[in-house]
UniProtKB/Swiss-Prot annotation:
The chain crosses the membrane at residues 10-30. It is found in: Cytoplasmic vesicle, Secretory vesicle membrane; Cytoplasmic vesicle, Secretory vesicle, Chromaffin granule membrane. Proteolytic cleavage after the membrane-anchor leads to the release of the soluble form. The gene is DBH. Its EC number is 1.14.17.1. Catalyzes the hydroxylation of dopamine to noradrenaline (also known as norepinephrine), and is thus vital for regulation of these neurotransmitters. It comes from Canis lupus familiaris. It catalyses: dopamine + 2 L-ascorbate + O2 = (R)-noradrenaline + 2 monodehydro-L-ascorbate radical + H2O. Coiled coil: none annotated. Residues 1-9 are cytoplasmic. The lineage of its organism: Eukaryota, Metazoa, Chordata, Craniata, Vertebrata. Cu(2+) B binds at residues 404, 406, 479. Changing residue 607 to G: In strain: Shiba. The active site is at 222, 404. This is Dopamine beta-hydroxylase. InterPro entries: Cu2_ascorb_mOase-like_C (IPR014784), Cu2_ascorb_mOase_N (IPR000323), Cu2_ascorb_mOase_N_sf (IPR036939), Cu2_monoox_C (IPR024548), DBH-like (IPR000945), DOH_DOMON (IPR045266), DOMON_domain (IPR005018), PHM/PNGase_F_dom_sf (IPR008977).
């Protein structure tokens, strides 16, 4: 059947023909494999009001994702897709739109001006379209990789999903521009690991750590709530935890974490309020040990059946800090929340204690990112010397990981190196966002043995900064951390590094000399044993002040990058008491890498369905959206 194309220009560029396939309501397109019949297991709201809901499932054998988009109140169409950082410009899209007579479904893309173009290669395949009591439901599929330069390559890690709502008909697809649309983004891990779920013990009990009737603020807010375990609560193993989300708030609760406090304080002042509040007790700074973490799109987190995370007992603090990130960009008012996390635990301790270890960079200003950088990399090392000293002879097994940076982080990767050869990636996120952090189960267990090296690299974007961003605990400072979850637990709690401070002082002196002493970058008066260069007359400064004085030209940038890539490091091979394992940890050479892993290349589909070159017309309720 011949149908009118959106425009002659689009038809000519796409097909050379105006022939399209008419989709009868409730009838699936028969090309390719049949769509899954069971409900898709993963589900998130796309918009703050929950009018758009996405469900999906992953087929690793087909290397395909099945999507189901539920549109509760459809006006004139909807855009859905993916982009590198969550912009609707330069996005890979699928579009449902109407010209007033017919409804069309097609693979499209947007340019940097937000102009929509129909893709010459149709890789989103519509499988079913139907009206339901909840709204319009579209089921479609898309390969991970398409080898189409206009398409997004779906890979492990964070994916920035984007959407836009069309409120009026358009005569052609090219008449649509994203600038005037109601639009937004949602971050999610699409490629969920397919792992078996361990059986839970019959004696398990539950503990709900929840907020108490919080009036959700009208802006994005981190909410902190301090709670405590019962008096004389004995040692238990957490075997699973799951989110508790107040009904109706699913689109507003972005992520949740529970931190265990150290036993430094016998008592901590109760608190429930904004984490940025001046009334927040200073003692809460010791509540940094992650006990549980959930983010939008994640389901229950299970520990391996032979391991559990210990909490409670005489040597453990009773205090737990609940932190909830509320994301309310449309300023929805009058909504109260009691969300949190439900811990499932057992008194019958499992064979192994699970542990959490910090990899990456020490929180110190000697590690810094120059301003106006698009992709500056800093790297932290857990060296062979440390794993040799701290790990048991049979090694450890990593089963989950949580990556962490502050506001400028865009990519994080941890690599396992053995005998100078890169063995495998522990965890990697090429589209990392500090606004989406969750503990992720690994697709397969990673075994780490004494003498192995764990290298964690973070990439940062500081294009909007005018001064250097230094390392530290503050939100405006930076971090590079991978919290690995493993068993059996060892005494090693932190395995990180930073460059040798004295070499950094040589860098500052070199910058000062190259600029004829115009900029003051003299070392601080205390806290360092580095000798001060002769002939300096300016006042002494702290490392952040020194970085603030650097003139960021090509010379200072290139030299700092070379410094970080080649000079010796100080290794923090620390026990839980913050005491290092015995040994010499200063001026350690960087690990030598003699063999690198090959970068994965996207696999193109071996064959394409005939429908992939046809525009689909959707007949829904008389042919109109």
């Amino acid at each position: 059947m011949q149908v009118p194309s959106p425009s002659a220009r689009e038809a000519a560029s796409m097909y050379g023909t105006a022939v399209a396939v008419f989709l009868v309501l409730l009838v699936a397109v028969l090309q390719g494999l049949a769509p899954p019949e069971s409900p898709l297991p993963y589900r998130i709201p796309l918009d703050p009001k929950g009018d758009l809901e996405l469900s999906w499932d992953v087929s690793y054998t087909q290397k395909t994702i099945y999507f189901q988009l539920l549109v509760q109140e459809l006006k004139a169409g909807v855009l859905f897709g993916m982009s590198d950082r969550g912009e609707l410009e330069n996005a890979d899209l699928v579009v449902l739109w109407t010209d007033g007579d017919n409804a069309y479904f097609g693979d499209a893309w947007s340019d940097q001006r937000g102009q929509i173009h129909l893709d010459s290669q149709q890789d989103y395949q519509l499988l079913r379209a139907q009206r339901t009591p909840k709204g319009l439901c579209l089921l479609f599929k898309r390969p991970f990789g398409t080898c189409d330069p206009k398409d997004y390559f779906i890979e492990d890690g964070t994916v920035h999903l984007v959407y836009g709502v069309l409120e009026e008909p358009f005569g052609s697809l090219e008449a649509i521009n994203t600038s005037g649309l109601q639009k937004g983004l949602q971050r999610v891990q699409l490629l969920k690991p397919k792992i078996s779920i361990p059986a839970l013990p019959e004696d398990r009990r539950t503990m709900d750590i929840q907020a108490h009737n919080v009036l959700i603020p009208s802006k994005t807010t981190y909410w902190c709530h301090l709670t405590k375990l019962p008096q004389d609560f004995p040692r238990h193993h957490i075997v699973m935890y799951e989110p508790i989300i107040t009904k109706g708030n699913e689109a507003l609760v972005h992520h949740i974490e529970i931190f265990q406090c150290t036993n430094q304080f016998q008592n901590i002042t109760s608190f429930s309020g904004s984490c940025d509040s001046k009334e927040k007790p200073q003692e809460l700074k010791v509540c940094r040990h992650v006990l549980a973490a959930w983010a939008l799109g994640a389901r229950a987190f299970y520990y391996p059946e032979e391991a559990g995370l210990a909490f409670g007992g005489s040597n453990s603090s009773r205090f737990l800090l609940l932190e909830i990130h509320y994301h309310n960009p449309t300023n929805i008012r009058g909504r109260y929340d009691n969300s949190g996390i439900r811990l499932h635990y057992t008194a019958k301790l499992r064979h192994f204690n699970a542990g959490i270890m910090e990899l990456g960079l020490v929180y110190t200003p000697v590690m810094a990112i120059p301003p106006k950088e698009s992709a500056f990399v800093l790297t932290g090392y857990c060296t062979a010397k440390c794993t040799q000293a701290a790990l048991p002879p049979l090694g450890i097994r990593i089963f989950a990981s949580q990556l962490h940076t502050h506001l400028t982080g865009t990519k994080v990767v941890t690599m396992l190196v053995r005998d100078g050869q890169e063995i495998e990636i522990v965890n990697r996120d090429d589209h990392y966002s500090p606004n989406f952090q969750e503990i992720r189960m690994l697709k397969k267990t990673v075994y780490v043995y004494p003498g192995d090296v764990l290298i964690t690299s973070c990439t940062y974007n500081t294009e909007d900064k005018n001064e250097a961003t230094v390392g530290g605990l503050g939100t405006q400072e930076e971090m590079c951390v991978n919290y690995i979850h493993y068993y059996p637990q060892t005494q090693l709690e932190l395995c990180k590094s930073h460059i040798d401070p004295c070499f950094l002082q040589k860098y500052f002196h070199l910058v000062n000399r190259s600029n004829l002493g115009e900029y003051c970058t003299c070392p601080q008066a205390s806290g360092t044993t580095c000798p001060q260069a002769s002939g300096t007359t300016c006042p002494r400064a702290s490392v952040p002040e020194q970085f603030a004085s650097v003139p960021w030209n090509s010379f200072s940038r290139v030299v700092l990058k070379a410094l970080y890539d080649f000079i010796p490091v100080t290794v923090h091979c620390n026990k839980s008491s913050a005491v290092r394992f015995p040994g010499k940890w200063d001026l350690q050479p960087l690990p030598e890498i003699i063999s690198k892993l090959k970068e994965p290349t996207p696999r193109c589909p071996t064959s394409r369905d005939q429908s992939s070159s046809s525009l689909t017309v959707v007949n829904i309720g008389g042919g109109k959206v």
